[in-house]
Amino acid sequence: MTSRRPDSFEGLGYRGREDPAFSGGYSGRSFNNSSSSDLQNWVTTPPDIPGSRNLHFDDRTPQFETAPDEAQSAAPPSEQLNRFAGFGIGLASLFTENVLAHPCIVFRRQCQVNYHARCYHLSPMTAISVMYNVTKTQGPKALWKGMGSTFVVQGVTLGTEGIISECTPLPRELSHKWNPKQVVGHLVLKGLTYVVAMPFYSASLIETVQSEIIRDNPGILDCVKEGLGRVMGMGIPHSKRLLPLWNLVLPTVLHGILHYIISSSIQRLVLYLLRRRNNGSPKHSSPGSGMDTVQSMLDAYFPELMASFAASLCADVLLFPLETVLHRLHIQGTRTIIDNTDLGFEVLPINTQYEGMRDCINAIRREEGTMGFYKGFGSIVVQYSLHATVLQITKMIYSTLLRNA
């Protein structure tokens, strides 16, 4: 390997050479023939990096250690707080709607399909008492059954809606400048989605209301298998009272579209009123203060949560009688055994003989009275009371974190 050392390199004396191209007016300095005073003037601290920034005389580039602290102090924490707030609030809402509320949904459905029941559970106190007895007798899993199948049904619904909207001109969402044609197309898309998801919804309903005493441990995809089996007429044998799927299309689509219309209308109305109130309320704190930042972030997230909460509550309450009819038609002929909702210690079979939606409505009104459509209504009170409590706790925690940030 050849050396890269210059031929005339003689240690520090190499600095004594003069380059002809750059020697005009500048003489090279040598350590060998320089005095100590010259060395002190010539050997100084390294100059600042040229071109790094425009420096004046005696200016220095800030040290590397101080740069991160200045950058951190200059960066506002609002963006990180917004991300944390959005994730935390969304997670709390998802947990409340799909996990914490599931025992109330299970008990409500059992009450709706139990035509034997003498106690209608219109009050939340009686509902809580029987739910406690069921949990004490069958274990904590008794009121959490079928939760996986509900997620499967939600996934099938979202996937079907996306596929149909991509393959057809039906709009998946309505713009601000909508017209009647777009509204009709959007509702047709929703109706087709409910028709496709209907057999899987029926299988999920059976998993949620069937008693834990005689129930096996189904897999999370058994809902899909049972739904496809019901479409093709295969799978678990059913009785002759099982209604064909085309008889279930009208109540299923009617309930789904009405629920969507009511919830969407209430949500937009409540969101408009909340934002109008927040924009019209006077600001007592000075701009840029901590309280103003907290209030602005709360106004950005919680109106949507409150609007969604009010929309779901109104839709579930208004459509409770129709939901009772729908669940009784779906469960008929499936040889399902449910818990006795009067006491919570026994099981009962479902042996109804409805011929259709109109016959079911007339039979409930004739045999159980008008309040028979509201069996299990107390569980809705418990469900949305828990939901409101979680929202309030989340708001308090979030406000505390923002004030201490």
Curated annotation (Swiss-Prot):
Residues 1-77 are annotated as: Disordered. GO terms for cellular component: mitochondrial outer membrane; neuron projection. Solcar repeats lie at residues 80-171, 299-401. It is found in: Mitochondrion outer membrane. Gene3D superfamilies: Mitochondrial carrier domain (1.50.40.10). One of its GO terms (biological process) is axon development. Keywords: Membrane, Mitochondrion, Mitochondrion outer membrane, Repeat, Transmembrane, Transmembrane helix, Transport. Transmembrane protein of the mitochondrial outer membrane that controls mitochondrial organization. May regulate the biogenesis and dynamics of mitochondrial cristae, the inwards folds of the inner mitochondrial membrane. Could regulate mitochondrial lipid homeostasis and thereby mitochondrial fission. This is Mitochondrial outer membrane protein SLC25A46. It comes from Danio rerio.
